[in-house]
Amino acid sequence: MTNSSSPLQAVEVRTYPIFTVRWLAVHALAIPTVFFLGAIAAMQFIRR
């Protein structure tokens, strides 16, 4: 019986960087979006 884990050892684990161009683009859009949604939601509770 052969060892079934030996072919799996040839796969190397790739570590990706956290801060990429995609990360910057997503957060450049997501952070102001969440801020404005929170501001609009807060405006709903303002009574004159």
Swiss-Prot record:
Pfam families: Cytochrom_B559
Keyword terms, alphabetized: Electron transport, Heme, Iron, Membrane, Metal-binding, Photosynthesis, Photosystem II, Thylakoid, Transmembrane, Transmembrane helix, Transport
Cofactor(s) listed: heme b
Keyword Magnesium: no
Disulfide bond positions: none
Family statement drawn from the similarity comment of this UniProt entry: Belongs to the PsbE/PsbF family.
Function of the protein: This b-type cytochrome is tightly associated with the reaction center of photosystem II (PSII). PSII is a light-driven water:plastoquinone oxidoreductase that uses light energy to abstract electrons from H(2)O, generating O(2) and a proton gradient subsequently used for ATP formation. It consists of a core antenna complex that captures photons, and an electron transfer chain that converts photonic excitation into a charge separation.
Annotated protein name in UniProt: Cytochrome b559 subunit beta
